[in-house]
Amino acid sequence: MTAPAKKPSAQEGLFWKTKTLEQMSGPEWESLCDGCARCCLEKLEDEDSGKIYFTHVSCRLLDAGLCGCKDYANRSDQVPDCVRLDPANVRTLNWLPPSCAYKLVAEGRDLYWWHPLISGDPNTVHEAGVSVRGRVQGTELDVNDEHLEQHIVQWPGLLPKRARLKKRPA
């Protein structure tokens, strides 16, 4: 007779609470992405102050409806300045949105209720108003660099009120 399979504890499933970013497996790392696609928006940096300004213009590879990359595996080949997040740079990049799970975990904070790892539903990031769905006004192919300033918006650097709630609204 074989011993029954050990049932994992609830805590074992919460790998982001027990592992550092460096200790995560590839699939764990990838699952930390909430799918908001805010990092796929074009950004401007003030050369004097270093302040980052988000725009509502996306990378040409972003599928703005799905909030995902059209060619994730080859994104760096197609868009050479696409930043691949890693444990080192998530601690230093000043343009990650306040909702970014990589940033939250690096700071020792927990994920929000709408994160798919918490909710079990990839649509809660949209429900909470965190994703770029319905807010992108074109891609980098549609807007010349010299006109990007006309597309600066505040919302990507902010966390919507309903997203800050402790639990999913009824």
From Swiss-Prot:
Matching Pfam families: CxxCxxCC
InterPro entries xrefs: Puta_zinc/iron-chelating_dom, UCP006173
Cited HAMAP family: UPF0260
Family: Belongs to the UPF0260 family.
Name of the featured protein: UPF0260 protein RPC_1790
Organism of this sequence: Rhodopseudomonas palustris (strain BisB18)
